[in-house]
């Protein structure tokens, strides 16, 4: 997102200090100064104060109905939300959201070649479920 145009900005919220540090390092290497801000915060405690009104929201893991509802309430008309997850709970959540609100629901998986003794086989990664919706 930030790399598409120098005027684009993004805010990341991360509860784990190591992941927040990694996000900051990536931002320093991949975006212009000030384009990407990381806030250290546990979203199970609600959204942090002072967030700008989003054009889009991406939840990459740890989604709950309460978090999605809080994000939907802040999302303006025409804003997009995308929720990804790999757990059965996340899949249940996005299937419910898709049933209630519509949007696009998909699952995708990746397999990598790996050794099985002297032979090789496919080793699957966790399947990702994704839901995307635009507030109309």
Predicted features and spans:
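Aromatic pocket-lining residues of Rossmann-like dinucleotide-binding sites
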Residues: 1-2
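Helix-to-beta-strand junctions that scaffold the AdoMet/dcAdoMet cofactor pocket
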Residues: 5, 32, 75-77
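Short beta-strand element of Class I
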Residues: 7-11
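S-adenosyl-L-methionine
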Residues: 13-56
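Conserved active-site and cofactor/substrate-binding residues in soluble primary-metabolism enzymes
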Residues: 14-18, 22, 66, 89, ...
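Short, ordered loop/turn segments at secondary-structure junctions
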Residues: 15-17, 43, 62, 86-88, ...
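Active-site segment flanking the S-adenosylmethionine/decSAM binding pocket
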Residues: 39-82
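C-terminal substrate-binding/active-site "lid" region of AdoMet-derived donor-dependent transferases
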Residues: 68-132
């Amino acid at each position: 997102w930030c790399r598409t145009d120098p005027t684009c900005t993004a805010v990341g919220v991360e509860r784990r200090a190591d992941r927040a540090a990694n996000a900051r390092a990536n931002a320093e290497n991949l975006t212009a100064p000030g384009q990407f801000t990381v806030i250290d915060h546990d979203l199970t405690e609600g959204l942090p104060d002072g967030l700008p009104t989003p054009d889009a929201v991406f939840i990459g893991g740890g989604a709950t109905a309460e978090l999605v509802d809080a994000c939907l309430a802040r999302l303006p008309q025409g804003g997009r939300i995308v929720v990804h997850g790999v757990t059965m709970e996340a899949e249940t959540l996005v299937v419910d959201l898709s049933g209630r609100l519509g949007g696009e629901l998909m699952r995708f998986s990746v397999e990598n070649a790996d050794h099985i003794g002297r032979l090789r086989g496919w080793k699957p990664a966790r399947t990702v479920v994704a839901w995307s919706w635009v507030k109309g």
